[in-house]
């Protein structure tokens, strides 16, 4: 086993490529988390978007149409979740799991109804997301390996991180969203429509979740496979906890998952048992969640001790 072949320059892009679907999923979860809503349904929204993107791309011959309709499908799924949770007071985790199970069932059913197959659907007629070729990077081998031939959605995820960070921390809307999540009673007293903000957060997350699925099926691959999200939605939620729902820190957490996945794939080529490789992302998930929970507990203890000191004065 040659370490220089495993830890080569191409590993950087492989890490980012593996992390991109998880970053989209994590951003989907981060938006609702800012409103104090745990979006367990990210997995289902993403899976629905993945199937819709492939179906529409195949029928229309347009990858852009596939993405737009996938985002619309994610919007509808998120709308169902928002209505059930906000209007009918259903428990958010139960609704999220229901969305996940429904998405798994409906995509499997529609795969059989529309394409007459099960398991996997792949066809040259599926229009994949284009890759961006930057000619001048060919003169710089290292940068060429890392940055050339990214898909449009891989570039866009970086833009999306910047946009969401700006919205959260530099706009009135973001301030209101965080107020609703942290101090809902105070926000309501200040005249903020708490339910309206929660609806907005969930619906926007649905758009991003649909985009996450579209990238997975049209950018990361060019096919649809039953349950192809493979728990990436849950990994995104874990990364969101790791980053405290901050878009940049959350994305860094996603890169940890991407690195584990990329390293695992390379180790398998050197005879490492496939069971170990398949186990790696889930071990990383447990570690990330454990670290984030411990750091959260430490932070809360510090806050309590600070408050106790102030009271003693």
Where are these regions (language model features)?
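Transmembrane alpha-helical segments in multi-pass inner-membrane proteins
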Residues: 206-209, 219-282
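Cytosolic-side transmembrane-helix boundaries in multi-pass membrane proteins
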Residues: 182-189, 193-196, 267-313
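Single transmembrane alpha-helix segments in multi-pass membrane proteins
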Residues: 10-59, 63, 67, 71, ...
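Transmembrane helix-bundle core of multi-pass membrane transporters
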Residues: 104-169, 272-277, 304-313
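Loop-to-transmembrane alpha-helix initiation sites
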Residues: 93, 120-124, 149-156, 198, ...
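Helix-loop-helix "hairpin" substructures at the membrane interface of multi-pass membrane proteins
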Residues: 145-224, 247-248, 252
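Short loop segments and helix-boundary regions at transmembrane helix junctions
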Residues: 34-38, 79-136, 230-248
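Hydrophobic core segments of alpha-helical transmembrane domains in multi-pass membrane transport
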Residues: 25-26, 50, 54, 104-108, ...
């Amino acid at each position: 086993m040659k370490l220089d072949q495993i830890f080569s320059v191409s590993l950087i892009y492989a890490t980012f490529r593996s992390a991109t679907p998880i970053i989209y999923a994590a951003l989907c979860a981060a938006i609702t988390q800012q409103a104090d809503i745990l979006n367990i349904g990210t997995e289902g929204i993403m899976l629905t978007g993945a199937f819709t993107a492939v179906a529409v791309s195949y029928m229309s011959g347009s990858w852009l149409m596939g993405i737009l309709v996938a985002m619309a499908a994610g919007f509808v799924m998120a709308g169902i979740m928002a209505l059930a949770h906000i209007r009918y007071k259903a428990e958010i985790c139960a609704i999220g799991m229901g969305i996940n199970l429904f998405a798994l069932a409906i995509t499997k059913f529609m795969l059989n109804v529309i394409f007459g197959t099960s398991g996997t659907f792949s066809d040259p007629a599926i229009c994949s997301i284009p890759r961006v070729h930057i000619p001048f990077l060919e003169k710089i081998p290292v940068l060429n390996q890392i940055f050339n031939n990214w898909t449009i959605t891989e570039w866009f995820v970086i833009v999306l991180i910047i946009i969401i960070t700006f919205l959260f921390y530099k706009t009135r809307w973001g301030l209101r969203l965080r107020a609703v999540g942290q101090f809902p009673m105070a926000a309501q007293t200040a005249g903020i429509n708490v339910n309206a903000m929660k609806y907005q957060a969930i619906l926007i997350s649905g758009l991003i979740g649909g985009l996450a699925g579209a990238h997975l099926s049209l950018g990361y691959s060019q096919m649809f496979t039953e349950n192809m999200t493979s728990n990436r939605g849950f990994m995104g939620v874990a990364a969101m906890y790791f980053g405290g729902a901050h878009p940049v820190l959350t994305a860094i957490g996603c890169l940890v998952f991407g690195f584990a996945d990329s390293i695992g794939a390379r180790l398998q080529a050197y005879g490492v048992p496939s069971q170990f490789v398949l186990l790696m992302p889930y071990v990383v998930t447990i570690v990330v969640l454990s670290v984030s929970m411990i750091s959260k507990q430490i932070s809360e203890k510090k806050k309590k001790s600070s408050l106790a000191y102030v009271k003693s004065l």
